[in-house]
């Protein structure tokens, strides 16, 4: 079996070579029809667009994307061509929650906010949104949830409307998949009308997909003081992001909220597992991220400890200094571990 693998997917080489007769590694943007022509499977990230142009006439039978999102896969074409695929739902949910937790700590400190006086609106309550809700509850915030597909299945006891979130929330964070059309369309969900409906000058956070927020509408909301701040990890037209928006957001990062080593290891494992299931392979492998360079953290309180584990301002400063390096900063992202990798001392 021959597998073509995105060369930025970590911790995969040894395991992949246990299940493949031949494994070829290439940059995600360089996957071509010629490269994939005689491959049985692909393991990709969002940079590889799997569509007719890439896949037609190839031997590819299965695509594993080491990501939660799958809008870079033309699922209709794959269905027609008999190509199956799998994503990695929930793989990096704890990583995104860590990013938002640290971002909120920075924001509340800079803006003198008391968490128990704040209301957060979480739009999209899947694997990530559910973990963010737990973070907010631990902070003592009031939590409002919006998830139309879940509300239709489960009823509206748990969920609320976008209108109520716009009226009552001090923090609004997006965790929806990107749907460009249909009943659950999320493309430009936050448009000019949405921003004009906001009542409390909230901080707006987007770690889902860039196209969920209309860039010009967000810029207008910042310029007109409709929102107090923005924390943006995902952008329209990546990697050619809007430089003016980058300059004006509180925190702007190169699509790395889910890039903890733990989340990457989960995604790698899930991708390999899906290939083994599809091809009926039996393989034993371990996907273990490296230990942090300083696993012992000394801090006077939990908030200090969390920011020592991960401070998104560092990632933001790098991108703001070199926006032209968006792809490089994302592809060569330094080791970041989640809380379970650390021991904390000094908290009384």
Curated annotation (Swiss-Prot):
PROSITE patterns: D_2_HYDROXYACID_DH_3 (PS00671). NAD(+) binds at residues 147, 233, 258. The active site is at residues 209, 238, 255. It comes from the Bacteria. Substrate binds at residues 46, 67, 259. Its main location: cytoplasm. It is found in: Cytoplasm. GO terms for cellular component: cytoplasm. Its EC number is 1.1.1.290. One of its GO terms (biological process) is pyridoxine biosynthetic process. Signal peptide: none annotated. It is an enzyme of class 1 (oxidoreductase). The keyword Repeat does not apply. Pathway: Cofactor biosynthesis; pyridoxine 5'-phosphate biosynthesis; pyridoxine 5'-phosphate from D-erythrose 4-phosphate: step 2/5. Keywords: Cytoplasm, NAD, Oxidoreductase, Pyridoxine biosynthesis. The keyword Oxidoreductase applies. Catalyzes the oxidation of erythronate-4-phosphate to 3-hydroxy-2-oxo-4-phosphonooxybutanoate. Homodimer. Belongs to the D-isomer specific 2-hydroxyacid dehydrogenase family. PdxB subfamily. This is Erythronate-4-phosphate dehydrogenase.
């Amino acid at each position: 079996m021959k597998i073509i693998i995105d060369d930025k997917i970590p911790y995969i080489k040894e395991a992949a070579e246990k299940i493949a007769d031949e494994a070829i590694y290439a940059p995600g943007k360089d996957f071509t029809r010629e490269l994939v022509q005689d491959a049985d499977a692909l393991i990709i990230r969002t940079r590889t667009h799997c569509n007719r142009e890439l896949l037609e006439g190839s031997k590819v039978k299965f695509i594993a994307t080491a990501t939660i999102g799958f809008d870079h896969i033309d699922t209709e074409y794959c269905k027609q061509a008999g190509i199956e695929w799998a994503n990695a739902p929930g793989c990096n949910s704890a990583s995104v929650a860590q990013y938002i937790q640290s971002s909120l700590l920075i924001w509340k400190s800079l803006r003198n906010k008391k968490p128990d006086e704040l209301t957060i609106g979480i739009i999209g309550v899947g694997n990530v949104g559910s973990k963010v809700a737990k973070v907010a509850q631990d902070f003592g915030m009031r939590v409002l949830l919006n998830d139309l597909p879940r509300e239709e299945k489960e009823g509206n006891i748990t969920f609320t409307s976008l209108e109520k979130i716009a009226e009552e929330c001090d923090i609004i964070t997006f965790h929806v998949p990107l749907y460009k059309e249909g009943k659950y369309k999320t493309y430009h969900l936050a448009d000019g009308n949405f921003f004009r409906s906001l009542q409390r000058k909230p901080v707006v956070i987007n770690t889902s997909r860039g196209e969920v927020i209309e860039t010009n509408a967000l810029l207008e909301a910042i310029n007109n003081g409709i929102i107090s701040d923005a924390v943006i990890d995902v952008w329209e037209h990546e990697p050619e992001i809007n430089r003016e928006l980058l300059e004006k957001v509180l925190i702007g990062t190169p699509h790395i909220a889910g890039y903890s080593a733990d989340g990457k290891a989960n995604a790698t494992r899930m991708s390999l597992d899906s290939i083994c299931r599809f091809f009926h392979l039996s393989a034993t492998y371990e996907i273990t991220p490296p230990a942090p360079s300083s696993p012992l953290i000394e801090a006077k309180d939990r908030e200090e400890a969390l920011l020592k584990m991960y401070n998104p301002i560092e990632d933001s400063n790098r991108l703001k200094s070199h926006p032209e390096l968006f792809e490089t900063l994302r592809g060569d992202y330094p080791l970041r571990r989640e809380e379970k990798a650390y021991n904390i001392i000094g908290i009384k």
